[in-house]
Structure formats: structure tokens, C-alpha cells
From Swiss-Prot:
Intramembrane segments: 347-377, 427-460
Recorded GO MF terms: glutamate:sodium symporter activity; high-affinity L-glutamate transmembrane transporter activity; metal ion binding; neutral L-amino acid transmembrane transporter activity
Reaction catalysis annotation: K(+)(in) + L-glutamate(out) + 3 Na(+)(out) + H(+)(out) = K(+)(out) + L-glutamate(in) + 3 Na(+)(in) + H(+)(in); K(+)(in) + L-aspartate(out) + 3 Na(+)(out) + H(+)(out) = K(+)(out) + L-aspartate(in) + 3 Na(+)(in) + H(+)(in); D-aspartate(out) + K(+)(in) + 3 Na(+)(out) + H(+)(out) = D-aspartate(in) + K(+)(out) + 3 Na(+)(in) + H(+)(in)
Region of interest: Disordered: 521-543
Domain-level remarks: Contains eight transmembrane regions plus two helical hairpins that dip into the membrane. These helical hairpin structures play an important role in the transport process. The first enters the membrane from the cytoplasmic side, the second one from the extracellular side. During the transport cycle, the regions involved in amino acid transport, and especially the helical hairpins, move vertically by about 15-18 Angstroms, alternating between exposure to the aqueous phase and reinsertion in the lipid bilayer. In contrast, regions involved in trimerization do not move.
Tissue specificity note: Detected in retina (at protein level).
GO biological process: chloride transmembrane transport; D-aspartate import across plasma membrane; L-aspartate import across plasma membrane; L-glutamate import across plasma membrane; potassium ion transmembrane transport
Species for this entry: Ambystoma tigrinum
Membrane spanning stretches: 48-68, 87-108, 123-145, 238-261, 271-298, 320-341, 387-413, 474-495
Name the record gives this protein: Excitatory amino acid transporter 1
Residues bound to Na(+) 2: T397
Length: 543
């Protein structure tokens, strides 16, 4: 039935219900505001104090950094000025090694092989999906905006790039997964270096025939039948830094073996559980110092910038393009993916990891941020420890959405600067190489610049042109690190949601095993009690 004027009465009732709902929510909000007490304010500040202090530290650090630029401090003065920030980095990096090992061992030991296999597969699928999406966003944005207009002659260059071969870089990645010495893996990574070697090469047959006809002396002919050739050959080398990939692989295998050992491996499992708990308590202490360290890290980096004008012009457009790409991925794609899988509010989840994101912005290292990320996810967002201990260390090592997006975008920007038209095949090569190279980028500051060489080499672009973008990389590195940490954290939430049935069944099995263990102890206790009753009062042994 409809009204005489043709209006649908249901539409009017829906509008009335909507208006009534809005009025009720408004009244409820007013009541909540009116009922706020001093205790509520204190409780809010207590719960979110760390986050507020960290946000204030970022703002104050930015203001302080721009304020002291006018003093033109020397390199030594800048080092002294940034010293509190350096202390924070050292404290966080101190905890990374034991945290990666203990968390992965305990996480893998707490799961059976079937559950850990399913969880690992879900994590890898998530990592690959988000990385491919990030690369796609970076390529589309840089093609649409086209920040590489103009010529590179007027652009500022900075730094020096070491040559590297793509094949050697990928082989190094695999070599680092299996370190020959676990102690050395704690402070060194394998890296192929190059040295010049001179070879004697035999001349081709047609050239030798001419030479022998010209030369009558046989000995002279034999000497001239060879010529010298120089070649850069790969030799084994090493660089300072934790081999995170090797430790991750070893810890996962070690934890899986301990879990399968059941009762025999309980002592080792308890040891790593205690170690993990001790590290997290140290993190709680360091978190009080984090705002001060972040303040001076940001202030020192801003004061260190040589020329603010470099950020303008062509590099300014490049910077804006990277920021737009990272924002689309971090603010739209990742939250949408989290909501689509879990049907939960992603912004509530992101609010719980806000301090980890700000720490990533300040430290520019996803590995250094790992202790804070653990604490935020487990305490604020109540993510299962078995998930965080498994997903976060692996994610901090191989899941680099921000880095993948940046590398694909920067490679095409360098092609545009050189007026180099890329065809579809070359763009596809860039996307595949950027995805693979981001896996090899360790969670250390400015690792993206190193792997960028691999991406440029894959399509024949000049690697020296990386020096064009180094001037703004310190800032963009912080943004892509924040994106990486956000991707790892949301990934932990998604994997936990998808693995909830395995986790619940694991809890049930653990409960049953405890009951069985108690039941097995009871007969023994009864027998021992009976034996004690049968013993004589005089317990001395008779000769």
C-alpha cells in the first residue's frame, strides 16, 4: 500500500527510526560527558600516558630540531645533541636478539606442527598479498603523478652506492637463512664482496692463425697467443649486524623440535618462556625512557639536514608521491583488509598500537620497534601470545610493505628522470623484483637503499642515480618503517582471527593433558602414603 501522493510509508518510518537513533546517541554522549569525573580522567591518562608522552615528544622534537638549525652546529655538536636518542636505539637493539629467539622458540613450541603449519601458511599468504598490493599502489601512483619531469642535471646528489649483482644478492639471502655459526650470526651477516682479478685468456683460432703467419719465431708466437683480461669476481665477505633471517629460521626449527619433544623438552620450553617474560619486563622499563629518546632522535635528524631547499622542487614532488602511496596503503588498504577478514573496527586495533607506530617513526627500524610492538599487541589489543611470538619476529624480518612500495615507486621515478620509457614487461620485472628485494631488506635503517640497487639492475637503470633520492630518504624511511610495523601488527590480528579454532583446540588439549597428569599423580601419591603408614616409627636403618 502507498499513500495518495505516491510516497512509500516505509521510507518515512525508516527516516524516523534513523533520526530517533541519532537523538538517542546524542543524549547518551551528553550524559557520558556530564558524568566524567576526575577518576575517569586519571584512568584515561594512566591507560594512555605513554602514547600521549610519545606524541608530545614527536611534536616537541620537530619544533626543537627546526629551532636549533639556525645555530649551524658542527658534526661533533650534533652527535652530542643526538646522544639521548642514540641511547634509546642501543637499548632497543640490545633486546632485539634475545626477543626474536625467545619469542619464536616459545611460540613454535606452544603449537603443534599442524597448527603452526596452518598459521605459517596464513601469515605467508597475508605477507605476499599485502606486499603485492603495496607494489601495485606504488607503480600506479608514480605513473599517474609522474614526479620525474625535467632533467636530473639540476638535482642534488648525495652519498655513494656500492655495486651489487642481483643474483649474488639473492644467493646471499639464502646463505643468511642457514648460518654456519650461530654465535657469529648474532653479530654478522654474510655479504658477497668483489675484488679485481686478472685472467690470461687464449686468443680465438682465427686470430691465432694470423698471428702465427706473421710471427716466425715459435716462442714469440706462444707468448702472444694469450692476452690479459680483468674481471670483478665475487668473494665471501661479511658485514656487521644481526643476521635476523638466520636466527628466525633456526629459532622456528628449534621451537618446533622442542614442541614435538613433549615432556622431554619442557625444561627448555620453560627456560625460553622465562627469558621472554624477563625481556618483556625490561621493555616495560625502557618504555618510560622512549619519549625522551624519540624527541632527540627526531630533533637531531632535523638539525642535521644540510639544505631544506632540496626537499622542494622535483624531489618535493617525489616525496609527496611516496607519502600519498604509503597513506593509501596504510590508511585505506590495510584497515579494509583487517575489517574484511575479522569484521572488527580496525581503528580501535590501530589505537592500541599507536605507541609502536610512533616509536617506528622515531627509530626508523622495525626490528628496534619490535619490543614495543609486542607489548602493545599483547597488553592493549589482547592478541594471543602464541600468535605474536610467531608472527611478529617473522614479519619484522620479511614483511616490508612500505619498503616494497617505495622501491617500485623510486625505480620508476629514476626511469622518468632519465627519460627512459618502460614497457609492460619491464614494469612487471620491477614489481616482481621489488617484492622479492623487500623480503631481503633486513629491519635496519635505510636497508631499502641497498636493495634498490637490485631493482634498478633488473631493468638496466643506472644505479648511481640512487644518490638523487638519498637527500629525502631519512624522512621517507621513517614513514615506510611505520607502514611496515602497521602491516605486521594488523597481520597478527588477522592471523589470530583465522587461527582461533586451532588456538581453542590447543587450549582444550592443554587442559586435558593437565587433568591427565594430575590423575596419573594421584595413584602414586596414594601408594606412597600407604607405604609411609607401613613404615616403623624408628626410621633408622638396622645393620
Amino acid at each position: 500500500m502507498t499513500k495518495s501522493n505516491g510516497e512509500d510509508p516505509r521510507a518515512g518510518s525508516r527516516m524516523e527510526r534513523f533520526q530517533q537513533g541519532v537523538r538517542q546517541r546524542t543524549l547518551l554522549a551528553k550524559k557520558k560527558v556530564q558524568n566524567i569525573t576526575k577518576d575517569d580522567v586519571k584512568g584515561f591518562l594512566k591507560r594512555n600516558g605513554f602514547v600521549l608522552f610519545t606524541v608530545i615528544a614527536v611534536v616537541v622534537g620537530s619544533i626543537l630540531g627546526f629551532s636549533v638549525r639556525s645555530y649551524h652546529m658542527t658534526f661533533r655538536e650534533l652527535k652530542y645533541f643526538s646522544f639521548p636518542g642514540e641511547l634509546l636505539m642501543r637499548m632497543l637493539q640490545m633486546l632485539v636478539l634475545p626477543l626474536i629467539v625467545s619469542s619464536l622458540v616459545t611460540g613454535m613450541a606452544a603449537l603443534d606442527s599442524k597448527a603452526s603449519g596452518k598459521m605459517g601458511l596464513r601469515a605467508v599468504v597475508y605477507y605476499m598479498t599485502t606486499t603485492v598490493i603495496a607494489v601495485f599502489i606504488g607503480i600506479v601512483i608514480v605513473i599517474i603523478v609522474h614526479p620525474g619531469k625535467g632533467t636530473k642535471e639540476h638535482m642534488h646528489r648525495e652519498g655513494k652506492i656500492e655495486p651489487v649483482t642481483a643474483a649474488d644478492a639473492f644467493l646471499d639471502l639464502i646463505r643468511n637463512m642457514f648460518p654456519p655459526n650461530m654465535v657469529e650470526a648474532c653479530f654478522k651477516q654474510f655479504k658477497t664482496s668483489y675484488e679485481k682479478k686478472i685472467f690470461k685468456v687464449t686468443m680465438p683460432a682465427n686470430e691465432t692463425a694470423v698471428m702465427t703467419s706473421v710471427l716466425n719465431n715459435v716462442s714469440e708466437a706462444m707468448e702472444t697467443l694469450t692476452k690479459m683480461r680483468e674481471e670483478m669476481i665475487p668473494v665471501p665477505g661479511a658485514v656487521n649486524g644481526v643476521n635476523a633471517l638466520g636466527l628466525v629460521v633456526f629459532s622456528m626449527c628449534f621451537g618446533l623440535v622442542i614442541g614435538n619433544m613433549k615432556e622431554q623438552g619442557k625444561a627448555l620450553k620453560d627456560f625460553f618462556d622465562s627469558l621472554n617474560e624477563a625481556i618483556m619486563r625490561l621493555v616495560a622499563v625502557i618504555m618510560w625512557y622512549a619519549p625522551i629518546g624519540i624527541l632527540f632522535l627526531i630533533a637531531g635528524k632535523i638539525a642535521e639536514m644540510e639544505d631544506m631547499g632540496v626537499v622542494g622542487g622535483q624531489l618535493g614532488m617525489y616525496t609527496v608521491t611516496v607519502i600519498i602511496g604509503l597513506l593509501i596503503h596504510a590508511v585505506i588498504v590495510l584497515p579494509l583488509l583487517y575489517f574484511a577478514v575479522t569484521r572488527k573496527n580496525p581503528w580501535v586495533f590501530i589505537g592500541g598500537i599507536l605507541q609502536a607506530l610512533i616509536t617506528a617513526l622515531g627509530t626508523s627500524s622495525s626490528s628496534a620497534t619490535l619490543p614495543i610492538t609486542f607489548k602493545c599487541l599483547e597488553e592493549n589489543n589482547k592478541v594471543d601470545k602464541r600468535v605474536t611470538r610467531f608472527v611478529l619476529p617473522v614479519g619484522a624480518t620479511i614483511n616490508m610493505d612500505g619498503t616494497a612500495l617505495y622501491e617500485a615507486l623510486a625505480a620508476i621515478f629514476i626511469a622518468q628522470v632519465n627519460n627512459y620509457d618502460l614497457n609492460f614487461g619491464q614494469i612487471l620485472t620491477i614489481s616482481i623484483t621489488a617484492t622479492a628485494a623487500s623480503i631481503g631488506a633486513a629491519g635496519i635503517p635505510q636497508a631499502g637503499l641497498v636493495t634498490m640497487v637490485i631493482v634498478l639492475t633488473s631493468v638496466g637503470l643506472p644505479t648511481d642515480d640512487i644518490t638523487l633520492i638519498i637527500a629525502v630518504d631519512w624522512f621517507l624511511d621513517r614513514l615506510r618503517t611505520t607502514t611496515n610495523v602497521l602491516g605486521d601488527s594488523l597481520g597478527a590480528g588477522i592471523v589470530e582471527h583465522l587461527s582461533r579454532h586451532e588456538l581453542q583446540s590447543g587450549d582444550a588439549e592443554m587442559g586435558n593433558s593437565v587433568i591427565e597428569e594430575n590423575e596419573m599423580k594421584k595413584p602414586y601419591q596414594l601408594v606412597s602414603q600407604e607405604n609411609e603408614l607401613e613404615k616403623p616409627i624408628d626410621s633408622e636403618t638396622k645393620m
